[in-house]
Amino acid sequence: MFSLKALLAKPFASYIIRKEKKWIDNPIETQEQVFQELISQASSTAFGADHDFISINHHADFVKRVPIRDYEELKPYVERVVAGEPDVLWTGKPLYFAKTSGTTSGAKYIPLTKESMPTHVTAARNAILSYIHETGNSQFVAGKMIFLQGSPVLHEQNGIQLGRLSGIVAHFVPEYLQKNRMPSWETNCIEDWETKVEAIVKETLPENMTVISGIPSWVQMYFEKIQQKTGQKVGDVFKNFNLFIFGGVNYEPYRAKFENLIGRKVDSIELYPASEGFFAYQDKQDEKGMLLLLNAGIFYEFIPADAFFDAHPTRLTLKDVKIGVNYVMIISTNAGLWAYNVGDTVMFTSTKPYRVIVSGRIKHFISAFGEHVIGKEVEQALKEAIEGTNFQISEFTVAPQITPESGLPYHEWFIEFENDVADVSQLAAKIDAALQNQNSYYFDLIKGRVLQPLKITMITKNGFQDYMKSIGKLGGQNKLPRLSNDRKIADKIYNLNLIK
């Protein structure tokens, strides 16, 4: 079917990509310009005064004056912003706070300013235009697109609105996409995930769906519901579905499952968005890496991951990075985050242009389903669960079980008990409740029936010692990781027959 929108998309894509090429071809100059603008604009803020921004001329000055901080370390400043104080981290007050699940100390409030907010929308748009420009495929813009996201309902605190990032972004969808966009506003506002998916399936089944977007674990559930309802592969139900857009977690563990659910291959675009900024998107179908966005009000620094915990690690700028090295990514942004450690590690796959893959987290974590569970959270959950019981725990580690033989995926807890234990079902339920209480993403995944509650697998006496010995890491400074985002340790434990 002829579509004017599809016809116009190609010249528009061509125009935007020509504009983008200017900074892509001048990466170092672009980053230097961003750096100077950020320092200049924030020199009159409380943070700028505390760190003598007025005398910062070069990156070396910045390194001397501004230490690396994570959210907890930046929190005293953020709390002042949340309380309604202007000119703290950035000029004026933020437009929004993206509220995200934090560590055990509660929710994180990430500011979004009038300067930073548009970049979240522009980057997503440009990812799609880049795909159109590269492939010549534009017919999909005439069909319906679904973005599986958080509720767009916002709350107010001290005159500033707050919500989930995906919910905030929903308010900024360009006019020309509004008619094509699904689900409806009413459905998007449903808080309960299972009810929401049912409503989305009902709304989308009769439509000409061409683009489906979201975190793979959520999309998988949507696809499975469609298959249950129709008895058909998703690619047969939606014959014109040809583009899957995703971000948030590693897609590789899902790829085979998705190809099976869809029944055929579809093109995909990987995005690298976060509340702290939209960092990169896949700009070439045959390239694994994502184009690092250098003109979006974010100044990047990179620290080799193996030196990150040194007393004074070297903070590299873009010109000094090398392909294939694991770096901790540090950002300074026009939302007022300064030398901020997002917690991600990246690896460059190319320097002409600069492309990255997300290689992991600087701390051990599990986020196979987008849950962002960190070591501190599992330790705290276990501590709360065994309080007042007779359980004595010698050692434990946690891994995701993405493809169980039956039922939903889950977190598998491998625990070695000091004492004799018969039944661990109640302990598992207690740990699960404590973890849900600490981590809102995990809570959503359990309540939305994307995950089933965790399961405990008991380990033989001294089993973990045997495991450490088998990998040549028994004793000394070697620690068993509390959790991993893959099943390397889990598989080895099974292979060594260390299950009780």
Language model regions located:
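Conserved AMP-binding loop of ANL adenylate-forming enzymes
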Residues: Y131-E175
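Conserved adenylation A10 loop of the ANL superfamily
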Residues: F97-I110, I456
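Amphipathic alpha-helical segments in well-structured domains
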Residues: M117, V121-I128, L162, G375, ...
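Active-site glycine/GP-rich loop and adjacent strand/helix microenvironment
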Residues: M1-I54, F62-V66, Y77, A83-G84, ...
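Conserved beta-strand scaffold positions in the cores of enzyme catalytic domains, especially
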Residues: Y109, M145-F147, S268, I456
